[in-house]
Every structure is written in structure tokens, then in C-alpha cells.
Amino acid sequence: MPYLLQVDFPYEGPWGEEMAAAMSGLAQSIAEEPGLIWKIWTESQATQEAGGIYLFQDQPSAEAYLAMHTQRLKGFGVPRVNGKIFAVNDVLSRIDRAPL
């Protein structure tokens, strides 16, 4: 069963294309994480937040990634990381065209 991880944290930029250029190495690293199916990068310049929505193959992979990524972000000086893990209801999600 896949698991969804929702992460957000305070972020002061850069945004958009500048963020993409600055974070491309990190994105390549995340793409290699065990159990990761996909990640959607999120950003809100209006609220000064960034984060992502991740789909993992299983709960242990999501939990391990959240623990590692929280430490990594804190190492970058991020004061607070919010993370939640949810089981995915495959049947209902497929009805609504989820990319599972």
C-alpha cells in the first residue's frame, strides 16, 4: 500500500525558476531515496513556506525519509519542519485519477 508524506517548513526563497536552479542537486538526490515513487515540490512566496508532497511504496520508507529530511533541513537552519504520513486509499484515489 502506498503512503503519502506531506512536508512544509518556513522558507525565504529563492522561488520559481531560481529555486529550481538552486535545488536541482537536492532534487536529484531525493529521486534516489529508497521507496520514493514521486515528489511534488510546493512553494508559497506569500506565506514564506516550501515543502513537498511525496508518494512512497510503504510506511517505513516514508518514516525513514521524514526523519532524515527533517535532520537535513534543520542542518540548513530551518527551525521547524511539519510532516504528516497518510495511508492512501487506492480504490477511491483511482476513481479520482490519482497518479498511483
Give the positions of each predicted feature.
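A short, exposed loop/beta-hairpin motif centered on an aromatic-Gly-Thr core
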Residues: 51-55
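Short S/T/G/P-rich N-terminal loop/turn motif that feeds into the first structured element of a domain
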Residues: 1-49, 59-67, 84-100
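A common structural junction motif
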Residues: 30, 70-77
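Conserved short beta-strand edge segments in small beta-sheet-based binding/regulatory domains
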Residues: 75-87
